[in-house]
Amino acid sequence: MARLRHIAVVVKDLEGAAQFYEKVFDLKRVGEEHLEMGSGIYLSDGVINLALLKYKGESGSGLKDAANFVGAHHFGFQVDDVEATRARIEAAGGKFFFTLGKSKEEANFEVKFKDPDGVIFDISEKGWLGTSK
């Protein structure tokens, strides 16, 4: 069975984005690369790798206007306390986007935010269908 263990997100401010996810979610910096096509900072919670990328141009990215593109659509973090995490997100410069679902006691209930670059992510206490803590 395949398991999701990596997601890559293109950001505007590489160091600022890394500091945001380190501060809010206690992710650890596990690597950094500076290549001709661009740079990357790699963070992890010990299970999944979050690659934050900043491209210099289209080469290697597969994206048109890669130097100006940011994002994947969104990704999510399962947390112990939605309210406490929301406070940490907002204190670090993240902005509330919207809530999806009826009750935080149910799987797939999520609170969506935008990080300082505008990348959408969500938090959930129960996680998502097919996931476990």
Annotate the PLM regions.
Residues 1-16, 72-77, 126-133:
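N-terminal beta-strand motif that seeds the catalytic metal site of vicinal oxygen chelate
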Residues 2, 8-50:
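Core segments of cupin and vicinal oxygen chelate
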Residues 42, 86-133:
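Vicinal oxygen chelate
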Residues 46-50, 57-59, 82-84:
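Short, charged/polar surface micro-motifs in flexible loops or helix N-caps
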Residues 51-53, 122:
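Conserved beta-strand in the GNAT
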Residues 53, 65-73:
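Helix-adjacent hinge/juxtasegments
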Residues 75-89:
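Mid-chain, well-packed structural core segment of small domains
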